[in-house]
Amino acid sequence: MNRPTAYVGIHADVYGGMTDIGRMIRDAWVFGILPETETCEGWELPKFDTLYGQVHAAWDPYGHMVSQLPADLRARHERIYDTAVKRARELGWSPDLDDDEDE
């Protein structure tokens, strides 16, 4: 079976990017690592290793907790994630879907 080697882009990803890669892209938007117009469509999967390191380093000073973000970043995070959750729900996503993996 041929597996795709390039990412489809956050908007074409499962439920509009409710995946680990989608969350990483949104976090990169929050921290200004990527512009919000960057969907990462066509990125080769290994390129995400570099992005992961950058996003992880950006979260470190805040203990990887939204509540520890300064007000401007917290507001940006809320706006980006609220939009993503709204879109995902329109596409049929439910937070309970993530729990199905444990069953």
Predicted regions and their residues:
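Short intrinsically disordered terminal tails
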Residues: 1-3, 93-103
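N-terminal acidic leader/helix
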Residues: 6-50
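A generic signature of intrinsically disordered, low-complexity regions enriched in glycine/proline
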Residues: 17, 31, 76, 81, ...
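Amphipathic protein-protein interaction modules
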Residues: 39-92, 96
